[in-house]
From Swiss-Prot:
InterPro entries attached to this UniProt entry: ESAT-6-like_Myco (IPR009416), ESAT-6-like_sf (IPR036689), T7SS_ESAT-6-like (IPR010310)
One GO CC term on file: extracellular region
Organism (species): Mycobacterium tuberculosis (strain CDC 1551 / Oshkosh)
Subcellular location: Secreted
Organism domain of life: Bacteria
Keyword tags: Secreted
Designated name of the protein: ESAT-6-like protein EsxL
Similarity comment: family membership: Belongs to the WXG100 family. ESAT-6 subfamily.
Amino acid sequence: MTINYQFGDVDAHGAMIRAQAGLLEAEHQAIVRDVLAAGDFWGGAGSAACQGFITQLGRNFQVIYEQANAHGQKVQAAGNNMAQTDSAVGSSWA
């Protein structure tokens, strides 16, 4: 009986998570543009409230990016570890 695992799929999934993390920067910048365009709501684009919101938004996006990127790395590492273990075990049974 042969069991075939698709370890490449695991690696690709990890890479996709990391790529999506990278795409967050574009979303972050789009939101900042919208906030600045609605600066009157904050008391002006240069107001402390507006700038404070943008700063906090940046911190939040940074945390999300770091966590998503780290998760993607862990998924890729797990896939690689499984592939290596599978290869080692398979070799010992040959």
